[in-house]
Curated annotation (Swiss-Prot):
This is Alanine--tRNA ligase. Zn(2+) binds at residues 569, 573, 671, 675. Its cofactor is Zn(2+). GO terms for molecular function: alanine-tRNA ligase activity; aminoacyl-tRNA deacylase activity; ATP binding; tRNA binding; zinc ion binding. Homotetramer. It is an enzyme of class 6 (ligase). It comes from the Bacteria. Pfam families: DHHA1 (PF02272), tRNA-synt_2c (PF01411), tRNA_SAD (PF07973). One of its GO terms (cellular component) is cytosol. Belongs to the class-II aminoacyl-tRNA synthetase family. It catalyses: tRNA(Ala) + L-alanine + ATP = L-alanyl-tRNA(Ala) + AMP + diphosphate. Consists of three domains; the N-terminal catalytic domain, the editing domain and the C-terminal C-Ala domain. The editing domain removes incorrectly charged amino acids, while the C-Ala domain, along with tRNA(Ala), serves as a bridge to cooperatively bring together the editing and aminoacylation centers thus stimulating deacylation of misacylated tRNAs. Catalyzes the attachment of alanine to tRNA(Ala) in a two-step reaction: alanine is first activated by ATP to form Ala-AMP and then transferred to the acceptor end of tRNA(Ala). Also edits incorrectly charged Ser-tRNA(Ala) and Gly-tRNA(Ala) via its editing domain.
Length: 880
C-alpha cells in the first residue's frame, strides 16, 4: 500500500506511542546548549546530555520524535552531493525512537522489524531487507539470525576501516566518551539497478539504500582506546522520512515523493526547461526547504556562522535557478507551495511566511546584481583551463570578495567542468582579508601600547564595581620603548600598573576610565585605562612631582565620566533587548563602542530600520527608563545559566564565574562592564543614526541624558530657523514646504516650456542660414550665451530637419567658447565630424573629441573664431 509522507510519520509516532513511548517535539534546528554544533543534524542531539550522563533528571524512559535536521559541513556533510544523488539533502526529517536505561537490543530490533514488515504497518517485503552489524556485536547478529530469522547471507558483518579504529557500524560521539555498535537496515530495490551489497565499498546507491540505523550505546571509550562497559545502556535510532517514503512509494529517488513533487512542479513552471529530472531543479527543491526552516528560526543571511550557511544555500539555489533560465527573483514564490506540502507538521512555516519571503527577496536582490558578472568572469577563466587542472585560489577569492560567490558555489561550478580549485591559496587570501578587516574595524582596534608578558608579572585586582577610589601600590612603571623604570619625574607618557585599582580597563566595547593617581610627592593624570591581557594599565602623564615604584598612592576615577559611561552601557542593554522585540530574535550584538558621550551598537539585521521601528525602539527604552527599574548584578557560572534565557557573546571567552546583568526579565545578559543602579538614571534615550556597515550588519548611534536633550534642543533650533526662513510657524512647516515644492515644480515646467520655445526659435533662425553644396546642407553659426546642453539639442534638431547635413555650432559663454560639429551618417563616408573639429582646434587652439557623426570641444582663440568658421566652409566644400 502507498502512503504519504505525513501518513508514514503519523504511523511511526503512533506505533511507538503504543509501545510506551512519549511523543516529544523535535528540538530547534539551532541547538540551544551545544556550541559544538551549528545545526541539529540528528534526532539524538537534544538527548546528548542524557547519553553522556550529564542529565539524570530526564523523566522519560522511552521517547519518539520527528526531528528537523540540517547537514552542510563537518563529518556529516551532504551539501556537495545534493542534487547529484537521489538520497542526499541539506534539510531532512528524521524519525527516531529512544530508550534511556530501558529496553535494549532485542526490543529495539523487534520494534523496527515489526514496524517495517507487519501488515498493520508498512508491510515491506522481508525478502527486500538486508542487515549490517558490527563484527564484534554477536548479540545483535544472533537476534537477526535466530529470532528474526534473517538468512545469514543477508546479515553483513562490518569491521573497522583499513588501518583505523573507526567503523561505519560503531557509533562514537567523539575520541572519548559514550559509544557502541549499531545495526543498519537496508532496502534492496532489485538487480535491475546497479550497486553492490551493503558493506562492499560503502554500499553504492541506488540499489541498496539504508533506511534505519539502530545505535546501542553501551560503552565508554577511554583515551587509550579501551572500551569500558556502561552500567546503564541506551538506544538511539534514526530513520530518514524522505528515504522510507521513497521506498514505500516504490521510487528510487527521494525527489519523486510527495514532499518534493509540488515544489518540483512549481520550479518547472518558473523555468525554461521541459523535464523535472534535472539536477538544478533538485538543488532548488532541496535548498528552499533548508532556507525556509533556517529563516523560521530567526537566522538571516550574513558572513558568519549560521547566517553564512544560510547565505551559501540561498546563493547556490539562485545560481541553479540561473541554470534553468530563471532571471528574475523566484525563491520567495515557492514558499506557499512549501507550506502546503510541509505545513501540517511544521506550523512555524505559515507563522513566519512573510518573514521567510522577505528575507529571500532581499538576499536574491543582493546576489542577482553580481551573479551575471561573476559567472561571466569564471566561465571566461574556465575556458582557458584544461579539464582535471586547477583554478587559482586568488580568482576564487576574487569571486568571493567582489561578487559574493561562496567558495562551495565556485567549487560546484568547477566540478561541472571537471576542474578543481587551489583551496589552500583561497584560504590564504581569505585569512589575510579577515585580518585586514579586524585591523580596520574601530570596534576591534588593538591597544596603542605593546607590553611584553614577561615585563609585567603581577595581576591587578579590580575593585571598580564597589569603589570609585582606593589606596593602592605601584607595582610597575613602563615608559616608551617598553622600558621599565623605577621612577617617573618628567612629563612623558607612561603606564602605571597597580596592585589594586577602581579604573575599568577598556574591554567589552566600553572605554576605559580616566582620573588621577596621586600621593604627597606626585600627581599622575590617567587619560585612558587599557587591558594588557589580564593586567590593567593606567595610561597617562605625570602632572607634577614624581612617583616611585612600590609607592602607596590613591587611585581615583573621574566619577562624572564613569557615571556617563555606566548610563550608556545600561542603555545599550536596553537597546539590544528592544531591537530583538521589534525586529525579531535574529538580532544579535556584533560589536559596540560605549563612551561617556554616546554609544554605538552593531547588530545583525538585513534591512534599514524605518522611522516607525526606530521610534518604537525609543519608546520601549524610554518607558523602561521612566519605570526606574533596578539593574541587578549576579555572580554565577556558565553551567548555571545554560537553561536560562541569558544573552551572551559566545565568541567571547568567559571565565568560570560570570556577571549576569538583569533589568527585570526584559534584559538578561552576561557582561563585565559597569552599569547604573536604576534605569531612571539614564534620563532620556535618543537614536541619532542607523546605518549599514557591512552586509547584514547595521549600526545604531545613540545618546542619553543631557546629550539626548542637547540633540533635541539642536533639532528644535533647526526647525525654528527653517520656520523663520520660510516666514512660517513651526507647526505649519510641512505645509509651507509642500507649497514651495509644488510652486517649484510649476516654475520648472514653465522654464522647460520657454527653453524648448527658445531652442525651436534658434533652430528656425539657423535653418535660414542653410547653404546647399552638392546634396549636403551646411549650417555654420556662432551663438552667444548658449550652454553645451543647448548646443547639443540644437545640433540634434537641425540634423533631424536636414537629413543630409553638416552642422557646426559654437557659442561664447563666460569668455569661453564651446563648439559642436554634427554630420549625418549618410555623409560620414565623405567627411568626419571629428576631422572638422580637429582642423578648427589646430588653428584656434583647444581640444576636443568625438566620433565621425558627432564631435565637441573647446576653443582658445575667440577673436579668430568667426574667420576660421568662414574658412572651414570652403574646406568642407572641397571634401564633398
Amino acid at each position: 500500500m502507498i502512503y504519504t509522507s505525513n501518513e508514514i510519520c503519523q504511523m511511526f509516532l503512533n506505533f511507538f506511542y503504543k509501545k510506551g513511548h512519549t511523543i516529544l517535539p523535535g528540538s530547534t534546528l539551532i541547538p540551544n546548549n551545544d556550541p559544538s554544533l551549528l545545526f541539529t543534524n540528528s534526532g539524538m542531539n537534544q538527548f546528548k546530555d542524557i547519553f553522556i550522563q550529564k542529565n539524570y533528571n530526564f523523566k522519560y524512559n522511552r521517547v519518539t520524535t520527528l526531528q528537523n535536521c540540517l547537514r552542510t559541513g563537518g563529518k556529516h556533510n551532504d551539501f556537495e552531493n545534493v542534487g547529484y544523488t537521489p538520497q542526499h539533502h541539506t534539510f531532512f526529517q528524521m524519525l527516531g525512537n529512544f530508550s534511556f536505561r530501558d529496553y535494549f537490543k532485542l526490543d529495539a530490533i523487534l520494534y523496527a522489524w515489526k514496524f517495517l514488515t507487519s501488515k498493520e504497518q508498512l508491510n515491506l517485503s522481508k525478502e527486500k531487507l538486508w542487515i549490517t552489524v558490527y563484527q564484534d556485536d554477536l548479540e545483535s547478529y544472533n537476534i537477526w539470525k535466530n529470532i528474526i530469522k534473517i538468512d545469514k547471507h543477508k546479515i553483513i558483518k562490518i569491521g573497522n576501516k583499513y588501518n583505523s579504529s573507526d567503523s561505519d557500524n560503531f557509533w562514537q560521539m567523539g575520541e572519548i566518551g559514550p559509544c557502541g555498535p549499531c545495526t543498519e537496515i537496508f532496502y534492496d530495490y532489485g538487480n535491475t539497478l546497479p550497486g553492490t551489497i551493503p558493506g562492499n565499498n560503502g554500499c553504492n546507491v541506488p540499489r541498496f539504500v539504508e533506511i534505519w540505523n539502530i545505535v546501542f550505546i553501551q560503552f565508554n571509550k577511554l583515551s587509550n582506546g579501551k572500551l569500558i562497559k556502561l552500567t546503564e545502556s541506551y538506544v538511539d535510532t534514526g530513520m530518514g522520512l524522505e528515504r522510507i517514503s521513497a521506498v514505500i512509494n516504490n521510487v528510487t529517488s527521494n525527489y519523486e515523493i510527495d514532499l518534493f513533487k509540488p515544489l518540483i512542479k512549481h520550479i518547472l513552471e518558473l523555468s525554461t526547461v521541459n523535464t523535472p529530472k534535472n539536477k538544478s531543479i533538485y538543488v532548488i527543491a532541496d535548498h528552499i526547504r533548508a532556507c525556509s526552516f533556517i529563516i523560521s528560526e530567526n537566522i538571516i543571511p550574513s558572513n558568519e556562522k549560521h547566517g553564512y550557511v544560510l547565505r551559501r544555500i540561498i546563493r547556490r539555489a539562485i545560481r541553479h535557478g540561473h541554470n534553468l533560465g530563471i532571471k528574475s527573483l523566484f525563491l520567495h514564490k515557492l514558499i506557499p507551495t512549501l507550506i502546503n506540502t510541509m505545513g501540517k507538521f511544521n506550523p512555524v512555516l505559515k507563522k513566519q511566511q512573510n518573514k521567510i519571503e522577505n528575507v529571500l527577496k532581499l538576499e536574491e536582490q543582493k546576489f542577482i546584481e553580481t551573479l551575471e558578472k561573476g559567472l561571466k568572469l569564471l566561465h571566461k577563466e574556465l575556458k582557458q583551463i584544461q579539464p582535471k587542472h586547477v583554478l587559482s585560489g586568488k580568482l576564487a577569492f576574487n569571486l568571493y570578495d567582489t561578487f559574493g560567490f561562496p567558495i562551495d558555489l565556485t567549487i560546484d561550478i568547477c566540478k561541472e567542468h571537471n576542474i578543481s580549485i587551489n583551496i589552500m591559496e583561497f584560504k590564504r587570501y581569505l585569512n589575510q582579508h579577515k585580518q585586514n578587516s579586524i585591523n580596520k574595524n574601530f570596534l576591534n582596534t588593538r591597544n596603542a601600547y605593546y607590553i611584553e608578558d614577561n615585563n609585567i608579572n603581577i595581576k591587578t585586582h579590580f575593585v571598580g564595581y564597589q569603589f570609585n577610589k582606593t589606596q593602592s601600590i605601584i607595582n610597575n612603571i613602563i615608559i616608551k620603548n617598553n622600558k621599565k623604570t623605577l621612577q617617573i619625574n618628567d612629563y612623558q607618557n607612561s603606564i602605571l600598573f597597580l596592585n589594586e585599582t577602581p579604573f575599568y580597563g577598556e574591554s567589552g566595547g566600553q572605554i576605559g576610565d580616566s582620573g588621577i593617581i596621586h600621593n604627597k610627592t606626585g600627581k599622575f593624570i590617567v587619560n585612558c585605562t587599557k587591558m594588557f591581557g589580564n593586567i590593567i594599565g593606567h595610561v597617562g602623564t605625570l602632572a607634577s612631582g614624581y612617583l616611585n615604584i612600590h609607592d602607596t598612592v590613591c587611585a581615583e576615577i573621574n566619577l562624572p565620566k564613569r557615571k556617563s559611561i555606566q548610563i550608556n552601557h545600561t542603555a545599550t542593554h536596553l537597546l539590544h533587548a528592544s531591537l530583538r522585540k521589534i525586529l525579531g530574535k535574529h538580532v544579535f550584538q556584533k560589536g559596540s563602542f560605549i563612551s561617556d558621550q554616546s554609544l554605538k551598537f552593531d547588530f545583525s539585521h538585513n534591512a534599514p530600520m524605518n522611522l516607525r521601528e526606530i521610534q518604537e525602539v525609543e519608546n520601549i527604552i524610554n518607558k523602561k527608563i521612566q519605570k526606574n527599574i533596578s539593574v541587578s548584578t549576579t555572580l554565577t557560572t556558565l553551567q548555571e545559566i545554560q537553561n536560562k534565557k541569558v544573552m551572551a557573546l559566545f565568541q567571547d571567552k568567559y571565565k568560570d564565574k560570570v556577571r549576569m546583568i538583569s533589568i527585570n526579565d526584559f534584559s538578561v545578559e552576561l557582561c563585565g562592564g559597569t552599569h547604573t543602579k536604576y534605569t531612571g538614571d539614564i534620563g532620556l534615550f535618543k537614536i541619532t543614526s542607523e546605518i549599514s556597515i557591512s552586509s547584514g550588519i547595521r549600526r545604531i548611534e545613540a545618546v542619553t541624558g543631557k546629550h539626548a536633550i542637547s540633540i533635541i534642543h539642536h533639532q528644535e533650533k533647526t526647525i525654528n530657523n527653517i520656520a523663520n526662513m520660510l516666514n512660517s510657524k513651526t507647526n505649519n512647516i510641512e505645509q509651507t514646504i509642500t507649497k514651495l515644492l509644488n510652486n517649484n515644480i510649476h516654475l520648472k515646467k514653465q522654464i522647460y516650456t520657454l527653453y524648448n520655445q527658445n531652442i525651436y526659435n534658434i533652430v528656425n533662425s539657423l535653418s535660414k542660414h542653410n547653404i546647399l553644396i552638392k546634396d549636403v546642407n551646411i549650417i555654420i553659426k556662432n551663438l552667444k550665451n548658449e550652454n553645451l546642453l543647448s548646443l547639443r539639442n540644437i545640433v540634434d534638431k537641425l540634423k533631424n530637419r536636414f537629413k543630409c547635413s553638416v552642422i557646426i555650432i559654437s557659442s561664447i559663454i563666460n569668455n569661453k567658447s564651446i563648439i559642436i560639429v554634427g554630420v549625418t551618417r549618410n555623409v560620414t563616408d565623405r567627411i568626419s565630424a571629428l576631422d572638422i573639429l580637429n582642423k578648427l582646434t589646430k588653428k584656434l587652439g583647444g581640444r576636443g573629441g568625438g566620433k565621425n557623426n558627432i564631435a565637441e570641444g573647446g576653443i582658445k582663440n575667440l577673436i579668430s573664431l568667426p574667420i576660421e568658421l568662414k574658412k572651414i566652409k570652403t574646406w568642407i566644400s572641397s571634401r564633398l
